[in-house]
Amino acid sequence: MLGKAGNNMQYIGFDIQDTHYGIASDNIIEILQDGVITPLPCAPQGVCGMTHYQGRSYPVLDLYDILEVPVDTSLSCMIMVETKQHYYFVNVHTIPYLFED
């Protein structure tokens, strides 16, 4: 897969149990450690709440909840993702790493 400049695409990776996942670095705005998440009552599965970033509120998705796997909640790492005109955070509960395709 090629990036915008024709180079190999870079990804921010993280592991959930024994599976590796990645988000294209072109879509990543920010990575936050230990951000504050405000729970939302009656939120659908996978939406763990909202967080504030630079004066705006954004939804936070929890991949562990979406995939229905247990999580050690002592660590929180949120990746801000941009997709077209939408922004949201993904809480991955692990330290992300960089890799290339």
Model-found features: residue ranges?
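An acidic, low-aromatic, low-complexity terminal/linker signal
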Residues: 1-101
